[in-house]
Amino acid sequence: MPFSNSHNTLKLRFPAEDEFPDLSGHNNHMAKVLTPELYAELRAKSTPSGFTLDDVIQAGVDNPGHPYIMTVGCVAGDEESYDVFKELFDPIIEDRHGGYKPSDEHKTDLNPDNLQGGDDLDPNYVLSSRVRTGRSIRGFCLPPHCSRGERRAIEKLAVEALSSLDGDLAGRYYALKSMTEAEQQQLIDDHFLFDKPVSPLLLASGMARDWPDARGIWHNDNKTFLVWINEEDHLRVISMQKGGNMKEVFTRFCNGLTQIETLFKSKNYEFMWNPHLGYILTCPSNLGTGLRAGVHIKLPHLGKHEKFPEVLKRLRLQKRGTGGVDTAAVGGVFDVSNADRLGFSEVELVQMVVDGVKLLIEMEQRLEQGQAIDDLVPAQK
């Protein structure tokens, strides 16, 4: 849980080596970067809102990570965290985002006209298409550190802005605390709503405090455009629909996001963004675009093929199970999405998914015929 600065001052009575966490069994980016020397150098610092080094690393201390999956192991508590603790964050960002340097500049492109194709992914294989991102509202602490009042103010602002959306984006807000248990579970099962706060990241970082206060979901009438409020980020914006028309999903995503940003600006609020890190979000893994473009895709043959992991890696894609992170693939259905977030524009990332998915389908069709796929294995993108 985030500590006040007075607690941080109290801890400074002990030498740094007495306060340094035991990271000997850890497999996360934070544990890889944080040395006793770096801890000693940064531990007395705090951001203007009072977020400390121990607040940054606590989630990664409490969750050592997975032997095969490298987790990040740290969070930001406000926009300034990435600057105040840059000696820790910069190497983590470089490691996590494929060598992204502290001097690199991020590019943004939310013009769906720049996407080539994507309206014709074969619906016999692609069951659904989805694009999501996060946004943080400047002037507020991020979820690991925000107070009840801040969280409620974010909810109020977001609901006011979203209620101005019209046309096929028009919809309404559903506060978590006014939903029945059954209604909540139905939305979770249908992949519309975030899960209950059982994830170690949410719990250890303090993001689940006061749950379900000021949390909720806004969606349009046909549930193809959704905004989660006050989960891991202030806002999570999602465009989704059944079938393989990623172009339509991305166009709705860009239009909705642009309208939301305009509505916030009309109330004199802007999203956290800078030229180096792009859009600022709670977890360093989501910096840049914050964008994950994914499809649920049926690959019963390719999914079992020994070359599948290597093909995905070369296409800069990643797979999850049918139910998302840490779940199994059911019936040969995988959730396949872009692996990158930072250093590529939104259009570039969606393009990688569109082009990559077409190749995966071609490979699956070859395997259905009992033919080899060696000649289709791509070079590293």
UniProtKB/Swiss-Prot annotation:
Q: Which residues bind ATP?
A: 128-132, 191, 236, 292-296, 320-325, 335
InterPro entries linked to this entry = ATP-guanido_PTrfase (IPR000749), ATP-guanido_PTrfase_AS (IPR022415), ATP-guanido_PTrfase_cat (IPR022414), ATP-guanido_PTrfase_N (IPR022413), ATP-guanido_PTrfase_N_sf (IPR036802), Gln_synth/guanido_kin_cat_dom (IPR014746)
Q: How is it modified after translation?
A: Ubiquitinated by the ECS(ASB9) complex, leading to its degradation by the proteasome.
Q: Where in the cell is it found?
A: Cytoplasm, Cytosol; Mitochondrion; Cell membrane
Phosphoserine (modified residue): where?
4, 199
Q: Where is this region: Disordered?
A: 96-123
Reaction catalysed by this chain?
A: creatine + ATP = N-phosphocreatine + ADP + H(+)
Broad class of where this protein is predominantly found: cytoplasm
Residues found modified as Phosphotyrosine = 125
Modified sites of kind 3'-nitrotyrosine: 269
Q: Which residues carry this modification: Phosphothreonine?
A: 35, 322
Boundaries of every Phosphagen kinase N-terminal domain copy = 11-98
Gene3D superfamilies found in the cross-reference section: ATP:guanido phosphotransferase, N-terminal domain, Glutamine synthetase/guanido kinase, catalytic domain
> Glycyl lysine isopeptide (Lys-Gly) (interchain with G-Cter in ubiquitin) cross-link position in this chain?
45, 101, 107, 381
- Return the CDD domains for the record: creatine_kinase_like
> One cellular component GO annotation, for this chain's record?
cytosol
Ordered alphabetically, the record's keywords are: ATP-binding, Cell membrane, Cytoplasm, Isopeptide bond, Kinase, Membrane, Mitochondrion, Nitration, Nucleotide-binding, Phosphoprotein, Transferase, Ubl conjugation
Tell whether Transcription is among the UniProt keywords: no
Question: What processes in GO biological process is this protein linked to?
Answer: phosphocreatine biosynthetic process
E.C. no: 2.7.3.2
> SUPFAM superfamilies this protein is in?
Glutamine synthetase/guanido kinase, Guanido kinase N-terminal domain
**Keyword Nucleotide-binding, does the record have it?**
yes
The family note in this entry says: Belongs to the ATP:guanido phosphotransferase family.
Q: What does this protein do?
A: Reversibly catalyzes the transfer of phosphate between ATP and various phosphogens (e.g. creatine phosphate). Creatine kinase isoenzymes play a central role in energy transduction in tissues with large, fluctuating energy demands, such as skeletal muscle, heart, brain and spermatozoa. Acts as a key regulator of adaptive thermogenesis as part of the futile creatine cycle: localizes to the mitochondria of thermogenic fat cells and acts by mediating phosphorylation of creatine to initiate a futile cycle of creatine phosphorylation and dephosphorylation.
Task: Give the multimer and partner information.
Answer: Dimer of identical or non-identical chains, which can be either B (brain type) or M (muscle type). With MM being the major form in skeletal muscle and myocardium, MB existing in myocardium, and BB existing in many tissues, especially brain. Interacts with SLC12A6 (via C-terminus); the interaction may be required for SLC12A6 potassium-chloride cotransport activity.
Task: Identify this protein by name.
Answer: Creatine kinase B-type
What organism is recorded for this protein? Sus scrofa
